[in-house]
Amino acid sequence: FQAEDGIRDRSPSRGLGDVYKRQIAYFLKGIVSFQNRNTIYDFNEKPNQGIRGARNWIKSHLDKWSDQPGADLFSCEFEFDYLMCNRTRHSQLLSIIPGHGPLRKELVILEAHLDSRCESLCDTICLAEGADDNGSGSALLMEISRNLCLFSLSRTIVILWVTGEEQGLGGSRSFATFCKQNAIPIKAVFNNDIVGGIECGKTSSPPSCPGPYQYDSTRLRLFSSGVTNSMSKNLARLSKLIIDDASKDSSFHLPQIDVMFGEDRSGRGSDHIPFRELGYSAVRFTSSYEHGDGNPNQPDYTDRQHSSRDILGQDINGDGILDSFYVDFNYLRNNTLVNAISAVNAASSTFDPYKLQLIPDVNSLVVKIENPQNALEYIIGIRKINSAYFDTIIFSKFPEITINDLNASTYYVTAAGRDSNGWIGMFGQEYNARILSNTNNLSFASPVELLQNRPNPFDELTLIPIIINDPQFVKNAQLEIYTESGHPIKFIKLDLKTGLNEILYDYQWNNYN
């Protein structure tokens, strides 16, 4: 592969190797060549066909890389029982890059589902290349394995080619359950599902794209659960911070990371969710634009997602060689680097989450880190209640700072530390402080506060915050939502607790009769 096709991260604190567009293209072409990778197209007597053939082909590359001088990588298969398409026994492939030192038993997981599907969920005969969904994520994992096998990291990296995503997340749920039952600590989970396409379809699951023949190769969506005091959301915020930071110091073009409010697109899901359900920090990367909403049974569905049309590309001039691709290899290469940087940071940072003391005053706030751990730099993230990402980020050499000229509001504050190698620890608990504009504001707060929803306007989810200052005033609570004309949309029974309560409103509730 020619050197000009590679990208080298020149940031000395990262030390990441080359990520090659041509290498990724080769991997993706190999994966789609198996034509149908349905979860149940997996037979001992057909080792070179279906999803078993794809697993064996990937493993042959892992074995080759593990034989390199200085490489530290081994692969294995995880067998599990989970009923999918009338079959119970399944298998999925892992590559493992062992950690070194006292944190080596903690895992950082990179995952992507290898299985594909066409219009029929359990069809093993149809053409189901699954080029973007999810050959793109599977090829991304191969390139990361090739690069990181020469790294020596504090935590162990597990790279998981999941099976059964299309049939209900069976593979990821089984592996997450295995980790939980065996008390295996997991620092972070990075899921990649549909990460190579840049074209919007006629349909797409919101929040997504404006319509057909629209393209975006500059942004990457990052989904995670929760908003306030969510470790998954904090992992998403940290990933954006790291990528924004790397973009300033690098000659290559990383995508802009959009931290989304929801855990996934409306009505959709993927393999990060079972890990989050069991208490692990887990996020999902997915393309800014998608070609389809994954529902091929609807009338006049012509998009590629979940259909036999999810192919690598077209031969326009009839010479037998694809020359128009539905997966953008530059975009997929950049998304591969996003994952490599995020995963290596998670596997390298050693700081414990910070505990904070907040001292509010009139138009000001003192933030004190109680366990600073001698960081080279302290990073304080501040946001208002309605923001998914930080509104303000402060970089300081000192573990105690005073922030002046604040508007009267409630602020949520968290912090992380950067070590001498540039790695950043996980953001810890969010602490809140109410800032007053003058001493006349010291009157008692209302027992219940219903705050403005954000984002507003919205096209998918919006967050409705409710603050309970005095729980004795609340017995039975219900949130009632109406149209401007008074038509009822949704009544939601609320179980409110003292402090902040967050309700995510789904745009689909507007589809009343």
Range-by-range predicted roles:
Residues 3-20, 417:
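Short, small-residue-biased leader/transition segments that mark boundaries at the very start
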Residues 26-98:
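A non-catalytic alpha/beta surface segment that caps or lines the substrate-entry region
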Residues 32, 195-214, 260-350:
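Active-site-adjacent mobile loop/cap segments within catalytic or ligand-binding domains
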Residues 110, 115-116, 121-169, 339:
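Alpha-helical metal-binding/catalytic segments enriched in His/Glu/Asp
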Residues 162-278, 282:
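Metal-dependent peptidase/peptidase-like ectodomains
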Residues 366-368, 440-483, 491-494, 500-510:
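Glycine-centered coil/turn sites that cap beta-strands in beta-rich domains
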Residues 403-424:
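Beta-strand-rich modules
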Residues 420-438:
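Extracellular fibronectin type III
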